[in-house]
């Protein structure tokens, strides 16, 4: 065995991104295998050794094409991160909290629809983000959580009471905490708690944060770390195709059905600049930003990008930490989390 000199550097577990839509100019929904490989490899070179390609609300036709391509891409391991499973973000969302999701395809969950999608995917779906207040969403949570799918609450106008009920029906996680979710509202003077408050109130809920320093400003990152059990926090990129691709015009979603966005100031925005349209973040930047801006330790930031997501996705028996018997997915980086070396399954990525 060869010896690698890491003097003055850190060795960490590979990063695990459970919520990303693309990068390197490609979206996972572009409709061809090559786009999946390009996006995955872009993220690999920034430290993501395990990735859960994420879809957007779309037609089932586009969704099934994405699933087909994911299955093909999974068979290609050369110079690739581990494609651990798919994260379906949509189509069962609240229209009022849709963010940049395509309203034309947003609908309520029916067993005929979601079981058709689930069965078509043939075990590829690891996670599904749903608005739990929709008619049929509780039954969906019951059915899919029993099948091993992580049920996550996202793009939702639910009340805290809705979330309380959703927890009884298999929902355990909040999709991009603070983004696309309700907060306290007033009705006849009375305060009604929203999903954000539920994230703090219910210890059993895990949350994920886009730690690009833009979606959540530094003080908000600090507050989340102060108020929520840090073992229940994962970092995500929620990156779109513009990750690693520079500023200017881009497209959110598939080239065919997606919408135009603008990348500036290190973030993607809707053309009228009224709201963000996903990040252009990579996992190394997530860790670096949390570490530098939120006043937490590098070890804690790394855990939130490795062991915590591994536990969330129930793959921590072989991923997420450096331990005997686990996959040798390793990173070597400096004090500023500039990646120097990457190993997937013990093989160095050049």
Residues covered by each model-derived region:
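Conserved, mostly hydrophobic/aromatic
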Residues: 8, 19, 43, 88, ...
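Alpha-helical scaffold segments that flank or form the walls of functional sites
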Residues: 18, 28-81, 105-120, 299-302
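Divalent metal-dependent hydrolysis catalytic cores, especially in the metallo-beta-lactamase
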Residues: 21, 37-66, 81-94, 121-133, ...
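Active-site gating loops and adjacent loop-to-helix segments of metal-dependent hydrolytic enzymes
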Residues: 41-52, 95-122, 165-206, 246-277
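Active-site core of metal-dependent hydrolases
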Residues: 115, 119-247
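His/Asp/Glu-enriched, well-ordered alpha-helical/loop segment
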Residues: 191-209, 225-237, 242-332
């Amino acid at each position: 065995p060869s010896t690698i000199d890491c003097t003055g550097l850190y060795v960490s577990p590979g990063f695990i991104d459970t919520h990303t839509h693309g990068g390197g100019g490609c979206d996972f929904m572009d409709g061809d295998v090559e786009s999946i490989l390009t996006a995955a490899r872009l993220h690999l070179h920034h430290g993501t050794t395990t990735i859960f390609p994420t879809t957007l609300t779309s037609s089932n036709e586009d969704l099934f094409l994405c699933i087909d391509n994911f299955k093909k891409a999974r068979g290609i391991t050369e110079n690739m991160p581990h494609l651990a499973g798919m994260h379906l973000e949509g189509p069962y969302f609240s229209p009022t909290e849709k963010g940049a999701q395509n309203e034309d395809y947003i609908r309520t969950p029916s067993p005929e629809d979601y079981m058709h999608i689930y069965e078509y995917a043939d075990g590829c779906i690891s996670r599904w983000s749903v608005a739990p207040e929709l008619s049929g969403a509780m039954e969906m949570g019951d059915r899919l959580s029993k099948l091993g799918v992580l049920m996550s609450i996202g793009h939702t106008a639910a009340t805290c009471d809705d979330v309380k009920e959703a927890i009884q029906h298999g929902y355990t996680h909040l999709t991009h905490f603070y983004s696309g979710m309700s907060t306290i509202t007033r009705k006849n003077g009375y305060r009604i708690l929203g999903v954000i408050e539920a994230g703090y109130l219910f210890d059993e809920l895990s949350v994920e944060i886009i730690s690009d320093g833009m979606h959540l400003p530094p003080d908000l990152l600090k507050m989340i770390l102060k108020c929520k059990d840090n073992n229940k926090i994962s970092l995500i990129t929620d990156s779109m195709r513009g990750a690693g691709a520079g500023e200017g015009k881009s497209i959110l979603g598939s080239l065919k059905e997606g919408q135009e966005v603008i990348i500036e100031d290190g973030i993607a925005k809707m053309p009228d600049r009224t709201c963000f349209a996903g990040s252009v973040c990579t996992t190394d930047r997530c860790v670096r930003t949390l570490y530098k801006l939120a006043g937490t330790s590098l070890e804690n930031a790394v855990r939130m990008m490795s062991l915590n997501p591994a536990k969330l996705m129930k793959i921590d028996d072989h991923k997420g930490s450096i331990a005997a018997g686990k996959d040798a997915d390793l990173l070597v980086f400096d004090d500023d989390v500039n990646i120097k070396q990457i190993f997937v399954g013990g093989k160095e990525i050049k």
